[in-house]
């Protein structure tokens, strides 16, 4: 491992030990904000420091074993120790490289998840509903909270568009690669001839930004419309213009929120989604200028814009970005999508490592 990387790891270990001492300090314990900040930093360093300690121990094992090579009785055991330690060192170094990759500061944030029906008419709306259930069940398995912000239901079931907020630990980092076109191939319930149809939905995932990171939005750039909610809620929603639609005129971005009975609450939620969309759109524009590696946040919803295909007759799901196919469609649609998400994250980390190697 390079000296510069070892020096970096040693400085992280020093900071970790410093934080350990600080967290036992009475003055820090009595200051909740400071204690919370130090605890978070401590937990973020824990894995990399433990990994580095293991690397140090393995190198020490090799040094001690090499001394025993001159002893005829211990030579065979020492050689075995050296071989095993060297093999593990390779694995640990790979792990350390990944742990030292630049972190996306947004990964720890909650996120907004948008699903929109694209081509395919009613069937696309039904599939949007299926995707919503898939993500909801996945969130449930992770003990995340899903909060409905806006839902435009389609006539045959499902949604023309649905927007939810997903809250929990590391939500955006886990879901961000779900953005893109999702295609379904199956025989619709409304199809009498038994023909397979292809429909599409687009998914967009955006981090919920803290107030300190939200862009300044000029009120003069906004058009705010209120209307009666079409969702559940009985008589109340039919008599109150509580739903809010905000249009950001310079970018043309439109956000609707109708989940709350209070117009004020709906407006606050819509403004938060709008801020995230504006920031994300700008980041996407900058990324497009620099590299083609990052995918567009939200495609057209056309069949050609696809990251994943769900084929019901064959019971398979294919992720086209990494040519991954699994034949457990029922499990996937019931929320077991870690085996689709983790390989994408691993591939992204490999791309980052390759880019760093080229720079060095």
Swiss-Prot record:
* Job description of the protein: Peptide chain release factor 1 directs the termination of translation in response to the peptide chain termination codons UAG and UAA.
What protein is this chain from?
Peptide chain release factor 1
Q: Which Gene3D superfamilies match?
A: 3.30.160.20, 3.30.70.1660, 6.10.140.1950
**InterPro entries named among the record's database cross-references:** PCRF, Pep_chain_release_fac_I, Pep_chain_release_fac_I_sf, Prokaryotic/Mito_RF, RF-1
Q: Which GO terms describe its molecular function?
A: translation release factor activity, codon specific
In Pfam terms, one family for this protein is: RF-1
- What highest taxon heads this organism's lineage? Bacteria
Q: What is its main location?
A: cytoplasm
Q: Describe its PTM?
A: Methylated by PrmC. Methylation increases the termination efficiency of RF1.
The UniProt family comment states:
Belongs to the prokaryotic/mitochondrial release factor family.
Q: Which UniProt keywords apply?
A: Cytoplasm, Methylation, Protein biosynthesis
Residues bearing N5-methylglutamine?
A: 235
Tell me which GO cellular component terms the UniProt record holds: cytoplasm
Write down the NCBIfam families for this protein, in alphabetical order. prfA, PRK00591.1
Name its cellular compartments. Cytoplasm
Compositional bias (Basic and acidic residues)? 285-295
Q: Where is this region: Disordered?
A: 285-309
